[in-house]
Curated annotation (Swiss-Prot):
SMART domains: IG, IGc2. Residues 24-235 are extracellular. Junctional adhesion protein that mediates heterotypic cell-cell interactions to regulate different cellular processes. During myogenesis, it is involved in myocyte fusion through the binding of jam2a on neighboring myocytes. The gene is jam3b. Residues 1-23 form the signal peptide. It is found in: Cell membrane; Cell junction; Cell junction, Desmosome; Cell junction, Tight junction. Disulfide bonds join 45-107, 152-211. The chain crosses the membrane at residues 236-256. Disruption phenotype: Morpholino knockdown impairs myocyte fusion during myogenesis. This is Junctional adhesion molecule 3B. Residues 257-302 are cytoplasmic.
Length: 302
């Protein structure tokens, strides 16, 4: 007796259901979960069908292509020891996720009594890390018309942080032309690198600047830093140069005059310049015509 098409369909469905009841089948409610660092996360591994009463359940962590056990022989091991547990029948719960937990995890179930005795599912976990306080660099003072660069950087956040700059608590837009307050400013803002560059600062650019680093896990800010913008006093600079030149000129003339008057010459009383002292203690007597022939030339001291 030939089977009708409806009977064939029913037969195929019944055979499929019979085979399914003899096979272990797994599924997950979320194959790409994410969690913020230090929070809990479930890696869902649900057994849809199985006939074996006590299947073997294993979890492996795969990072950089290298698998390692995190649940084996009914015990948490490896990187998750004392930080995870199994929720029946096979879901892995990480209690305190850290950034090193970002990896692929494979749930494996072996059921010896089932016709299809093995199944596995792969789950990719991402642990998001909040940015730390960024390192900010703001020049303290810049003359009008000169270029200036402000830098902001942090390297702990995951995914990679994006950056915002603020002046006097107001966000600086990426495009200065999009805001009336910054319309005349000549700057470029790189939100990925955290740099704010002025090609020529104006007086209006002075103020308190701070930077914010943000990603999906949170935000962090550095403290405000003051940047002053001052005018260059050309007249004062010229006057200062003139005063310095005049002072140097006066010193030079004074030294020259002193040299000409002999203040810098010295005579040594030695050698050919030595002059013997005059005779003050001796007396020469020479007889004059009135004194006759007497002549006394001896020098004697009274």
């Amino acid at each position: 007796m030939a089977l009708t098409p409806l009977a064939c369909v029913l037969l195929l469905l019944s055979m499929q259901c019979y085979i399914s009841t003899l096979a272990v089948l797994l599924k997950s409610t979320n194959s790409k979960p994410w969690v913020n660092e230090f929070e809990s996360i479930e890696l869902s591994c649900m057994i849809e069908s199985i006939t074996t009463t006590k299947p073997r359940i294993e979890w492996k962590k795969i990072k950089n292509g290298d698998p390692s056990y995190v649940y084996f022989d009914n015990q948490i091991s490896g990187d998750l020891e004392r930080r995870a547990k199994i929720r029946e029948p096979a879901t892995l719960v990480i209690l305190n996720a850290t950034r090193s937990d970002s990896a692929d995890y494979r749930c494996e179930v072996t059921a010896p009594n089932d016709q299809k005795s093995f199944d596995e599912i792969l789950i990719s976990l991402t642990v998001r890390v909040k940015p730390v306080v960024p390192r900010c660099s703001v020049p303290k003072s810049i003359p009008v018309g000169k270029p200036a660069e402000l830098h902001c950087l942090e390297d702990e956040g995951y995914p990679k942080s994006q950056y915002q700059w603020f002046r006097n608590k107001e966000e600086i837009p990426l495009d200065p032309k999009s805001s009336p307050k910054f319309f005349n400013s000549t700057y470029t803002l790189d939100g990925e690198m955290g740099t704010l560059k002025f090609s020529a600062v104006r007086k209006e650019d002075a103020g308190e600047y701070y930077c914010r680093a943000k990603n999906e896990a949170g935000i962090s800010e550095c403290g405000p830093q003051m940047m002053e913008v001052y005018d260059i006093n050309i007249a004062g600079i010229i006057l200062g140069v003139v005063v310095v030149v005049m002072v140097l000129l006066c010193i030079t003339v004074g030294i020259f005059c002193a040299y000409k008057r002999g203040y810098f010459t010295s005579q040594k009383q030695t050698g050919n310049n030595y002059k013997p002292p005059a005779k003050g203690d001796g007396v020469d007597y020479v007889r004059t015509e009135d004194e006759g022939d007497f002549r006394h030339k001896s020098s004697f001291v009274i």
